[in-house]
A protein has these predicted regions:
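Mature soluble domains of exported/periplasmic/lumenal proteins and thiol-rich metal-chelating peptides
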Residues: 20-148
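Bacterial N-terminal signal peptides
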Residues: 6-16
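Amphipathic alpha-helical hairpins
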Residues: 5-6, 51
Length: 148
């Protein structure tokens, strides 16, 4: 009985994880979200749109590419932009943020750097592969302190 219950719980948790994000066609989006998508993809290629629940509310993630750089936006059901993650060069970050990222990665390889904007809050995120080959991300504020 315990084994059967374990399998049921595991299956349920997997279903929740995989059901959390769903691909969506533009024509199936609410009108306000469609307008934001059109506005934000004028000079970019639309890679994909997904729908998910965050804090009990439906949000949409818009993935775009422009000039070889990724730009992802989180949009609420009213079409307002919640956050933007934009690929940038490490050298474009404030010196303290660059230094903190380089110190954290030490000997590993940075694979992607993004500016993350949520309202007036701006932080920076680096994806990297450690010396041991482990993939990870590290976020910092402009002053180099770790971002939560």
């Amino acid at each position: 009985m315990k084994i059967a219950t374990s399998f049921i719980v595991t299956g349920f948790l997997c279903a929740i994880v995989f059901a959390a994000e769903t691909k969506v066609k533009i024509e199936d989006l609410p009108a306000q979200v469609q307008n934001t998508v059109k506005e934000q993809t004028k000079n970019a290629k639309l890679v994909g749109v997904t729908k998910e629940k965050e804090g009990g509310k439906t949000v949409y993630e818009l993935e775009t590419m422009a000039n070889g750089k990724s730009r992802d936006l989180m949009i609420d059901g009213a079409g307002a932009i919640i956050s933007v993650e934009e690929e940038v060069a490490l050298e474009s970050l404030p010196a303290a943020a660059q230094s903190a990222i380089q110190k954290k990665v030490a000997g590993g390889k940075i694979t992607k750097v993004e500016t993350v904007t949520k309202g007036s809050d701006v932080s920076y995120e680096a994806a990297y592969t450690s010396k041991s080959g482990k993939k990870a991300e590290y976020g910092v504020n402009a002053d180099g302190t770790a971002h939560k």
